[in-house]
Amino acid sequence: ITNACFEPANQMVKCDPRHGKYMACCMLYRGDVVPKDVNAAIATIKTKRTIQFVDWCPTGFKVGINYQPPTVVPGGDLAKVQRAVCMLSNTTAIAEAWARLDHKFDLMYAKRAFVHWYVGEGMEEGEFSEAREDLAALEKDYEEVGVDSVEGEAEEEGEEY
């Protein structure tokens, strides 16, 4: 189940984590989980270089284990399982999702779609531009983090004698 967390099909936001670098990763396990197995799975991910971390945060994993089995809502859509894992991560791959969001915002804002509703509730039009600039800056920061760590690795490899 640990490896499944890193599959693009299991992400809450549509982005491919294999195209980015991780800055942090928190794995929260629940149920019938053995710490030794968890450590082995994470060690395998690290040694196989399944995922890449930025160079300034090489370890990057936090792990939590709750031995209570996952609960299910009676009459809900989820099946009862013995164990579950939830991963919270910070990866540069999210920049591609922000790029899509920027594009959609630009299309809608150019037509002033829904702007009147927000202005009617007390928001100023300048706040839209400010929020768009903030998101663009965040996207740029994440792209730079991914590129900087790639360049840093290339420099390190070039310094070997």
From Swiss-Prot:
Gene3D superfamilies according to UniProt: Helix hairpin bin, Tubulin/FtsZ, C-terminal domain
Catalysed reaction equations from the record: GTP + H2O = GDP + phosphate + H(+)
Site description Involved in polymerization, residues in chain: 161
Record InterPro entries: Alpha_tubulin (IPR002452), Tub_FtsZ_C (IPR008280), Tubulin (IPR000217), Tubulin/FtsZ-like_C (IPR037103), Tubulin/FtsZ_2-layer-sand-dom (IPR018316), Tubulin_C (IPR023123)
Top EC class of this enzyme: hydrolase
E.C. no: 3.6.5.-
Modification comment: Undergoes a tyrosination/detyrosination cycle, the cyclic removal and re-addition of a C-terminal tyrosine residue by the enzymes tubulin tyrosine carboxypeptidase (TTCP) and tubulin tyrosine ligase (TTL), respectively.
Gene Ontology biological-process annotations: microtubule-based process
Keywords associated with the record: Cytoplasm, Cytoskeleton, GTP-binding, Hydrolase, Microtubule, Nucleotide-binding
Localization, UniProt: Cytoplasm, Cytoskeleton
Role summary: Tubulin is the major constituent of microtubules, a cylinder consisting of laterally associated linear protofilaments composed of alpha- and beta-tubulin heterodimers. Microtubules grow by the addition of GTP-tubulin dimers to the microtubule end, where a stabilizing cap forms. Below the cap, tubulin dimers are in GDP-bound state, owing to GTPase activity of alpha-tubulin.
Subunit and partners: Dimer of alpha and beta chains. A typical microtubule is a hollow water-filled tube with an outer diameter of 25 nm and an inner diameter of 15 nM. Alpha-beta heterodimers associate head-to-tail to form protofilaments running lengthwise along the microtubule wall with the beta-tubulin subunit facing the microtubule plus end conferring a structural polarity. Microtubules usually have 13 protofilaments but different protofilament numbers can be found in some organisms and specialized cells.
Membership in a protein family: Belongs to the tubulin family.
Protein name per its UniProtKB record: Tubulin alpha chain
Lineage: Eukaryota, Metazoa, Echinodermata, Eleutherozoa, Echinozoa
